[in-house]
Amino acid sequence: MKILVTKNKEVASQNAFELLQTDIINGAQVLGLATGSSPLGLYQKMTSSSADYSNLISINLDEYVGLKPTDPQSYHYFMEHHLFAQKPFAKSFIPDGSNLNATEVINHYNKILATYPIDTQILGIGNNGHIGFNEPGTPFDSQTHKVKLTPATINANARFFTSSKDVPTEAYTMGIGSILQAKHIILLAFGEQKADTINKMVNGKITTAVPASALQQHPNVTVILDEQAASKLA
C-alpha cells in the first residue's frame, strides 16, 4: 500500500489525476468510479483537462435503491453533472436504483463486471471504514449485493438531502470482492474526521469490522491523503 500525503485536497486531486492519466496511457480501459465529496476534485481535474475518455468504459460502485436516474440525489445524476456531461465515456454503467428487483440488478451488474474487468478503481472511504456501500461486517469475498445502510452512513449522507429522513435506507453496491479485482486502486480521503479510520485501514487488523482494511490484501493500492487525514498515521 503506497501512501501519498499532500498539503491539501487540491494537490491530492492533482496527484490522483496524474496517476489516473498514467494508468490510461499504460493501457487502462475500464475505470471504476466513486461518488461523494472525495473524488470531486479529481473529476474537476478530468473535466478541465484536454483528456479524451470517449474510448473508455466506466463502472460505478453503487446507487441508492428507489431513486430514478433523473433524481438529483441519485448517483446517476451526480456522475452526469460532475463528469459525464463534460467528458462522455464509450459506455458508463451504474446500478439501476429504480429497479426494485434486486436479483435482476445484482445478476446484471455481476455480468458487467465479468465482461469489463476494472483496471483502475477510484475509492473514497466512510467514517466507519466502508468502501462503496460495503458496511462493517461485509464479507471480503462479497460480490454485487443490496445493503441496508447503517445509521452512521445515513447521517453522514444527510448533508446531501433535505434531512436524514429523506436519505434512502438501502443501496446496490459492488462487493469488496469485486473491488479487490481491480488492477490498481486509488483511494482518496480528506479531513481530520477520516484520520482514525485511515489509521485503522493502513495499520490496523484486517477485519470485516473495518471494510477498507481488506485493501491491505491488494498488491497495488495508492492512498492519497491531505495532512489532516494522515494525522494519525505513525
Curated annotation (Swiss-Prot):
Q: Gene3D superfamilies of this UniProt entry?
A: 3.40.50.1360
Q: Which reaction does it catalyse?
A: alpha-D-glucosamine 6-phosphate + H2O = beta-D-fructose 6-phosphate + NH4(+)
Tell me the route in metabolism or biology where this protein functions. Amino-sugar metabolism; N-acetylneuraminate degradation; D-fructose 6-phosphate from N-acetylneuraminate: step 5/5
Tell me the enzyme class. hydrolase
Q: Which UniProt keywords apply?
A: Carbohydrate metabolism, Hydrolase
In the record, biological process GO terms are: carbohydrate metabolic process; glucosamine catabolic process; N-acetylglucosamine catabolic process; N-acetylneuraminate catabolic process
User: Keyword Hydrolase: yes or no?
Assistant: yes
Active site feature: 62, 128, 130, 135
Which CDD domains does this entry report, sorted A to Z?
GlcN6P_deaminase
Q: Name one GO molecular function term.
A: identical protein binding
Among the entry's GO cellular component annotations, what is one? cytoplasm
Q: Which InterPro entries does this entry report, sorted A to Z?
A: Glc/Gal-6P_isomerase, Glucosamine6P_isomerase, NagB/RpiA_transferase-like
Q: What does this protein do?
A: Catalyzes the reversible isomerization-deamination of glucosamine 6-phosphate (GlcN6P) to form fructose 6-phosphate (Fru6P) and ammonium ion.
Record's protein name: Glucosamine-6-phosphate deaminase
